Design a protein with these regions (language model features):
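Active-site-adjacent C-terminal substructures of enzyme catalytic domains
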Residues: 200-292
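Active-site glycine- and acidic-residue-rich loops that bind
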Residues: 99-104, 171-173, 186-198, 248-264, ...
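Histidine-rich, glycine-flanked metal-binding segment
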Residues: 1-3, 9-51
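Divalent metal-binding pocket/active-site signature
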Residues: 127, 135-231
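Active-site loop-to-helix "anion-binding N-cap" substructures in soluble metabolic enzymes
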Residues: 64-69, 92-101, 171, 218-230, ...
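Divalent metal-dependent hydrolysis catalytic cores, especially in the metallo-beta-lactamase
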Residues: 60, 76-105, 120-133, 160-171, ...
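Residue-level marker for buried hydrophobic side chains located in beta-strands
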Residues: 53-55, 190, 273-274
Length: 292
């Protein structure tokens, strides 16, 4: 057994200082005040934190590799890099690309799902695109953004039975047909990379869209049209009590007051911090292009 002492332990109840954590047989068997009578190998954390492993629902790559490199070595490299940063479970996320590249990504994921070295880390696939707005493609390749095609989506599902989530621009989903199709198959539908305004987003949130992909990034807030202010997608999201939102809380994508605002309006149970990490994460690269 291993005993961690002088730890700041993060639990669902908050942070507890100067606590002891005992680990045995790869399980946490005790958390509390120091148990000096227990014979264990002891590690003094000197006030450092102990936390449950992180979960990342939106991650493309890291350590110089991408999940869409289409080889097992790169796939493992990404998973192991994030594991070292404390992320024990993640959702490999695709990029908008040509369909043959998306097929290869889905086929590779299916192979890795049975790979002993990474299978316990995988939570399913998050498909980000290709049904995104070309006006709000952000770092995605707008060349491959396209309107919703349910038949094409079924081909994705045929390639991989573990697709758990798909990001779609609601205005690209006429009548929200794909949202209904996916929800019938217990797949989460996330609004993102969207050029829509308040009315369309409100309808989407009432028609199966249950998550928001990297809120504020690649979407509209208050928009001036013909000299008048119009509520945007962001206002629709903030006024909806049920939808969960992603935030990239890296101190770069969003300033602290924005995160504080979302927390005040959405509450902790409807906010998901994600990395949206790409291949340059964890490297010394000064320039990097997503997907390349």
């Amino acid at each position: 057994m291993i005993k961690l002492i002088n730890a700041k332990v993060i639990t669902s109840k908050g942070v507890s200082n100067n606590k002891c954590v005992v680990i045995g047989n790869e399980h946490i068997i005790y958390v509390g005040d120091d148990t000096k009578h227990m014979q264990c190998d002891t590690i003094d954390l000197k006030g450092n934190y102990v936390s449950a492993g992180f979960i990342d629902l939106h991650v493309h790559g890291g350590a110089g590799s991408s999940f869409m490199d289409y080889d097992q070595i790169s796939f493992k490299k990404v998973v192991k890099y994030h594991e070292k940063q404390g992320t024990l479970n993640l959702m490999p996320t695709s990029l908008t690309a040509a369909n043959n590249e998306i097929y290869r990504f889905l086929e590779l994921y299916t192979q890795m799902k049975s790979n002993d070295s990474v299978k316990d880390s995988l939570l399913g696939v998050h498909m980000e695109g290709p049904f995104l707005s070309t006006n709000k493609c952000g770092a995605q390749d707008g060349l491959f953004c396209t309107k919703v095609d349910v038949d094409e989506c079924q081909k994705y599902l045929d390639k991989c039975s573990d697709i758990k989530r798909m990001t779609i621009a609601p205005e690209m989903d006429e009548g929200f047909q794909l949202a209904h199709y996916l929800r019938e198959r217990n797949i989460s539908v996330s609004a993102g990379h969207t050029d829509c305004l308040y009315e369309t987003m409100t309808k989407a949130l009432n028609s199966g869209y249950d998550m928001i992909t990297h809120m504020y990034s690649s979407m509209n807030g208050i928009t001036m049209i013909n000299g008048f202010r119009n509520a945007g997608a962001i206002e629709a999201i903030l006024l909806n009590d049920d939808v969960c939102v992603e935030l990239i809380a890296d101190g770069k994508h969003l300033p602290a007051p924005i995160i504080e605002l979302v927390y005040k309006l959405k509450g902790k149970d409807n906010i998901i911090f994600v990395s949206d990490a790409m291949r340059a994460t964890g490297t010394d690269a000064k320039e990097s292009y997503i997907g390349k």
